[in-house]
Amino acid sequence: MKAFVTGAAGFIGSNLVDRLLAEGHEVIGWDNYSTGQERFLEAASRSPRFRMVRGDVLDRAAMSKAMAGCDTVFHLAANADIRDGWAHPARDLEQNALGTFNVLEAVRAAGARRLAFASTGSVYGEPAVSASAPTPENAPFPTQTSLYAASKVAGEGLVSAYAEAGHLDEAYVFRFVSILGDRYTHGHVFDFCRQLMHDSGRLRILGDGRQRKSYLHVQDCVEGVLHAVGRGAARSAPHRTEVYNLGTDEFIDVRASAGLICAAFGANPRLEFAGGERGWVGDSPFIFLDTRKVRATGWSPRFSIAEAVPATVRWLQANPWVFAARS
């Protein structure tokens, strides 16, 4: 495989690059470094099979040129700051929806025939399922709760349209839960750790702490993506597109995840809740995905939530530079 990875210097992207190189593939990375970190690619940069290109997904011509000769594109570049969406409403449209369109046009120009798109479980908004049932891939999309999720719905539609029109032989859409692990750089686990490193006696939680989330370790995420793409099921799918939920078979509320984080720190802070029931516009009160489809192919996660959260805390404690890099 000769792979092109957008968002290659980011959290998930850099882990994917390392895994692709470990499996012997050639990789071209693409990132504008708006949130990505060069340090995440230190190991990859020593490989003769890796080339990194600084560029933006809004620069379609440059991206098409860099993509030449690649057969598979992993599109992970995106603005993932859900909370900040309404402060900069054009960002999700430009980086996520228009960025995905540009990637697809670059794919068409470069002649790549296989694409994997990183979407999100947030596309399900507030799914019309019972209070504890996981959401399957065929659940209808309700009213969207964030600009980020809306932009990912647009991206999914573009990917499937290009595949249906014959511009892709295989398209894969992966709806992730929240991802944790080495090189993690945003999300409430990151925020809680930053607070506790500054003051272990107080922890401010946005929302009432009852929001229920599911988490997946980044190594399980990368393995799931490569496992599904490697099977090639989209080649025989009715519309050349396969959609997979990626997550664990469990969830945890924010208050309990705060407990795991505090235990890893050896801290017992005073908890303070702010922002009402949810904490910010766009926060989903319940994300729990039905992963039976991808599990039926032979993939399953190795890390539980109780393992992934402390592992992430340990990495952040060992790499405090990342907090300054993301400030």
Predicted regions and their residues:
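Catalytic helix-loop patch of NAD(P)-dependent Rossmann-fold dehydrogenases
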Residues: A87-N102, R113-R114, V123-V173, S178, ...
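Catalytic Tyr-X3-Lys helix of short-chain dehydrogenase/reductase
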Residues: R108, V159-E164, L196-M197
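Hydrophobic alpha-helix immediately C-terminal to the catalytic Tyr-X-X-X-Lys motif of short-chain
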Residues: A154, L158, Y162, F192, ...
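C-terminal substrate-binding subdomain of Rossmann-fold SDR/epimerase-dehydratase oxidoreductases
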Residues: L16, M197-S327
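Residue-level signal for the nucleotide or nucleotide-sugar donor/cofactor binding architecture
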Residues: G36, L58, A87, Q95-L98, ...
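NAD(P)H-binding glycine-rich loop region in Rossmannoid oxidoreductase-like domains
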Residues: V57-E94
